[in-house]
Amino acid sequence: MAAVDSFYLLYREIARSCNCYIEALALVGAWYTARKSITVVCDFYSLIRLHFIPRLVSRADLIKQYGRWAVVSGATDGIGRAYAEELASRGLNIVLISRSQEKLQMVAKDIADTYKVETDIIVADFSSGREIYDMIREALQDRDIGILVNNVGVFYPYPQYFTQVSEDTLWDIVNVNIAAASLMVHIVLPGMVERKKGAIVTISSGSCCKPTPQLAAFSASKAYLDHFSRALQYEYASKGIFVQSLIPFYVATNVATPGSFLHKCPWLVPSPKVYAHHAVSTLGISKRTTGYWSHSIQFLFAQYMPEWLWVWGANILNRSLRKEALSCKA
């Protein structure tokens, strides 16, 4: 009995001496909870401010804000074409750049007829290296370029392990995903700085959020574009230039395999037209955004989840996409 009493007294003494530590831990827990709560509220406010409020107010005058002409690379399909059409719907004249003259002429005519704006085309294969840029520079030199959209890019035929990717594809990723955006900015930025206004939109990818297995080179090239855009914003914001890093997740383009299960979730995987309509409304508001409300929710989850969980999910998704692509080939 005496032993029990002694233990009870000892326990009380230890508990009394630990009270200050328990209170300190409670304060730390309260601070952490408050901080996370404030972060969630701020993220929710940002989501509303970016993706819903702009749809309730009158559209910004992009011509007055940036200039009369927009240049869109990779403009004959997918996000590039949809973005060009959305800018044209707001009255901007469009210079379309892509490698297929036939497609360029068709898209340029469609845009001119539908939106009653001027269009021009530049036939350029960005995978051919530096030789095309003098021609592009000459074609754009007399234009009042207000907006540059760096959309052109190449993707793997389907998710693959790095050693399975061909050397040609790796060179295309360097030349098209990385070099094209860098050199297009180098061409148009001096004119924007001289006029003290302009916008540069560079389309990265949600795969740049964290290391993405089976898309190693592609996701790394998109991470370059994200960091490049953010650094440019810091360099040139004081000169009147708005630089936006656009980080879409899956959009229903050729990148998401036609017939894929991804196309069955339109609220999660929007059409290029829907995506571009939302993305353009964020221009001038957010320097770094996914461009679409459900993608912003995905981006928030990606930011907060541990890297191992991202890698696990990416492996499952990319294995499914590879299996589906290979079964379609068979």
Swiss-Prot record:
Keywords (A to Z) from UniProt: Acetylation, Mitochondrion, NADP
Protein family: Belongs to the short-chain dehydrogenases/reductases (SDR) family. 17-beta-HSD 3 subfamily.
Record gene name: HSDL1
Primary location group: mitochondrion
Organism: Bos taurus
Protein name as annotated: Inactive hydroxysteroid dehydrogenase-like protein 1
Chain positions covered by the region annotation Required for mitochondria translocation: 2-82
Keyword Mitochondrion among UniProt keywords: yes
Thylakoid recorded as keyword: no
GO CC annotation: mitochondrion
